[in-house]
């Protein structure tokens, strides 16, 4: 429902699932306090700070968005493991067809559950999705207080630099 896709993507960002706010307005990362768009801008993916309602323009900058699960929830922990695993299978096919340079998963816990990789850590993964490299980033939700804006800027910047080198 909220996929933002295109050809020649540098990075396909994979969220866990839409928030209730995102589902209501029809745009990704729309919940107030979400740090996705500030992180994209700070990392140099976009030339200015985008608003959620501009998400459909992101493929013009090599950025795509999808989610493991399409079902909106108040919190990601309301999803079942089965929903995440099913979403990972769909994601594999999507990535195979789109061939983005890099897949960036937004959330370590969701990645571990969806892909059955309990020992995964942040950063570049030894496994691929759809034959493409995978990088795990912290989830930009405002509920994730472990990371500050400067952390997101640095980590998303590492992803941009890596993807541009592929």
Regions found by a protein language model. Give the residues of each.
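Short N-terminal binding/cap micro-motifs at the start of the first secondary-structure element
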Residues: 9, 20-24
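Short, surface-exposed acidic-centric catalytic microdomains
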Residues: 25-82
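Internal catalytic-core helix/loop-beta-alpha segment
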Residues: 60-119
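Short amphipathic alpha-helices and their capping/turn segments at secondary-structure boundaries
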Residues: 1-6, 49-58, 94
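Short histidine/acidic/glycine/proline-rich micro-motifs that form metal-
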Residues: 27, 110, 141-144
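Compositionally biased, charged N-terminal/linker segments
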Residues: 18-19, 30
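C-terminal capping/extension of enzyme domains
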Residues: 2-10, 32, 39, 75-91, ...
């Amino acid at each position: 429902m909220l996929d933002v896709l295109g050809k020649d993507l540098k990075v396909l960002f994979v969220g866990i699932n839409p928030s209730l706010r995102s589902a209501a307005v029809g745009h990704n990362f729309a919940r107030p306090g979400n740090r996705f768009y500030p992180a994209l801008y700070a990392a140099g993916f976009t030339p200015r700070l985008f608003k959620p309602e501009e998400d459909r323009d992101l493929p013009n900058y090599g950025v795509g968005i999808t989610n493991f699960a399409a079902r909106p929830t108040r919190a990601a922990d309301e999803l079942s493991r089965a929903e995440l695993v099913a979403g990972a299978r769909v994601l594999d096919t999507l990535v195979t067809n789109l061939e983005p340079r890099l897949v960036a998963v937004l959330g370590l816990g969701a990645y571990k559950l969806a892909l059955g990789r309990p020992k995964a850590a942040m950063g570049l993964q030894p496994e691929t999705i759809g034959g493409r490299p995978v990088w795990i980033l912290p989830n930009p939700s405002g509920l994730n207080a472990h990371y500050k804006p400067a952390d997101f800027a640095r980590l998303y910047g590492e992803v941009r630099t890596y993807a541009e080198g592929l």
